[in-house]
From Swiss-Prot:
Keywords of this entry: Cytoplasm, Ribosome biogenesis, RNA-binding, rRNA-binding
Summary of the function given for this chain in its UniProt record: Member of a network of 50S ribosomal subunit biogenesis factors which assembles along the 30S-50S interface, preventing incorrect 23S rRNA structures from forming. Promotes peptidyl transferase center (PTC) maturation.
Chain positions covered by the region annotation Disordered: 1-20
Highest classification ranks of the organism: Bacteria, Pseudomonadati, Pseudomonadota, Gammaproteobacteria, Enterobacterales
PANTHER family, per the entry: UPF0307 PROTEIN YJGA
Pfam families in the cross-refs: DarP
InterPro entries, A to Z: DarP (IPR006839), DarP_sf (IPR023153)
Name of protein: Dual-action ribosomal maturation protein DarP
One of the record's GO molecular function terms: ribosome binding
Gene giving rise to this polypeptide: darP
Protein's UniProt keywords contain Cell cycle: no
Family membership: Belongs to the DarP family.
Subcellular location: Cytoplasm
An example Gene Ontology CC term for this record: cytosol
Length: 183
């Protein structure tokens, strides 16, 4: 017994007829691959983090265990473990993890910028001498003028005698301590 075309249409349940009105969003295979690769890269970033930084990232127990295992594995096993971490991330919302990583990277960038600023201050102190000390005291009012001037004089003597820059390092450490106590 053959069914006619009209009979096939009559056999369709009512709720499936309404599905034709719903918009279907097609995602290309390439886009799916790009997203999977991005999540695998996110997993690789997690694996490259240190233990303290990893504790600041909101991860569930399974994902944290997989990341810690990947940190211990070498060679080909590591690649497979990274793929597993990427797969685990696809099943989760990666947004909070990415946000936490961005915050960590931003904090690192701020610290690098501060170190560059302190290096420039140190170099100015060594080159220009006591003329820069009032500028330092304006930035860091609790700085010890006498200690700073002593370190600057020693650094200038070391530079003139082509000795290792021990006092220059001490100036940088002192400026870093001042910056940390100011914050």
């Amino acid at each position: 017994m053959k069914q006619k075309y009209e009979d096939w249409l009559n056999d369709v349940p009512d709720n499936q007829e309404d599905d034709e009105d719903d918009e279907i969003i097609w995602v290309s295979k390439s886009e799916i691959k790009r997203d999977a690769e991005a999540l695998k890269d996110l997993g690789a970033e997690l694996v490259d983090l240190g233990k303290n930084a990893l504790e600041k990232i909101p991860l569930d127990d399974d994902l944290r265990a997989a990341v810690e295992l990947a940190q211990r594995i070498k060679k080909e096993g590591r690649r497979r473990q990274l793929q597993l971490i990427g797969k685990m991330l696809r099943a989760r919302d990666p947004e909070p993890i990415q946000t936490a990583l961005d915050k960590l990277n931003n904090r690192h960038n701020q610290q690098v910028a501060l170190f560059h600023k302190l290096e420039q201050l140190r170099d100015r102190l060594i080159e220009e001498g006591d003329d820069v000390v009032p500028d330092i005291l304006a930035l860091y009012p609790h700085a010890d003028r006498q200690q700073l001037r002593s370190l600057v004089r020693n650094a200038q003597k070391e530079k003139a005698a082509n000795k290792p820059p021990k006092s220059a390092r001490q100036i940088f450490q002192y400026l870093r301590e001042l910056a940390e106590t100011t914050d």
